[in-house]
Regions:
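Structured segments of extracytoplasmic/periplasmic soluble domains
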Residues: 3, 28-36, 51-55, 133, ...
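C-terminal cap/loop subdomain of S1 sulfatases and analogous C-terminal strand-loop tails that border
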Residues: 7-14, 18, 23-26, 30-116, ...
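Solvent-exposed, polar/charged alpha-helical surfaces in well-ordered, non-transmembrane soluble domains
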Residues: 27, 31, 46, 50, ...
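Short, composition-biased linear "edge" segments at structural boundaries
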Residues: 93, 141, 199-201
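Intrinsically disordered, low-complexity polar regions and short flexible loop motifs
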Residues: 123
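Active-site-proximal N-terminal segment of extracellular/periplasmic enzymes that hydrolyze or transfer
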Residues: 128-136, 196
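Bilobed periplasmic-binding protein-like "clamshell/Venus-flytrap" ligand-binding domains
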Residues: 144-163, 167
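Extracellular calcium-associated, cysteine-rich motifs in secreted modular proteins
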Residues: 160-161, 166, 174-219
Length: 219
């Protein structure tokens, strides 16, 4: 066995179903080499070396976010949240006109439902979109808020809307338009608590994920 196999002897025939990300490699290798992250260097990934020791008590954070607020070779303008077996995708180009986001030659898809939801345990190829399945609407609302709040907390950049080459606004994520979903079961629909549908708790709004945050007014 190589030195690394001796140092990290994964038990034979073991299987772990936790999710990890490619950006976990950097902090993991640093730990293996007993090196520290350079001062002032922000690291998105997590050290997953305990998996290689067969530490069954270790679990990486089982929520992973990706954010591509720009045009590139194989996809355009999207953000994702992976939580366990579930993955939600927000497609900015389905919410906004393509020409509003990118000045190059492209196609217009604005008007389509911008959210996608997949169960990767059953559908690793992401071919069965469950975003508009009534049975999954609450899940989508919760994951959408989780994605939006993570991006806001990270002070993420968003696509810029343009007209004739001039910036005219920002393409923020919009919550799914599911007026009947009540995620916290407090009798008040999510889009009443989050009246502007931006996924964050603004002044005068209450938390759709916390039933205790809504206090009815007594007559």
């Amino acid at each position: 066995a190589s030195p690394i196999q001796q140092e990290y002897p994964i038990p034979q025939n073991s299987v772990n179903h936790d999710i990890v990300a490619i950006w976990d490699i950097y902090p993991t290798i640093l730990n293996m080499l007993k090196l520290k992250v350079p001062v002032g260097h922000q690291v998105d990934g997590e050290d997953i070396s305990p998996y290689f020791r067969g530490d069954s008590s270790f679990h990486r954070t089982q929520k992973i976010f990706q954010h591509f607020p720009h045009h590139h070779s194989y996809a355009n303008f999207y953000s994702t949240c992976r939580e366990g077996d579930w993955k939600v995708i927000y497609n900015y180009m389905d919410q906004y006109a393509h020409t509003d986001l990118y000045s190059g030659n492209g196609y217009r898809t604005a008007g389509r439902f911008p959210w996608q939801l997949f169960n990767l345990k059953d559908d690793i190829g992401e071919s069965n979109d469950l975003a508009q399945d009534p049975a999954q609407q609450e899940r989508l609302m919760r994951m959408a808020r989780s994605l939006i709040r993570e991006l806001r907390q990270a002070d993420a950049q968003y696509p810029v809307l343009t007209r004739n080459g001039q910036a005219v606004g920002t393409a923020y994520i919009r919550m799914p338009d599911f007026p009947d979903v009540d995620s916290d079961g407090d009798g008040v629909p999510d889009l009443v608590e989050d009246a502007n549908g931006n996924g964050v708790i603004d002044p005068g709004e209450t938390d759709p994920d916390d039933a205790s945050s809504f206090v009815p007014i007594r007559q």
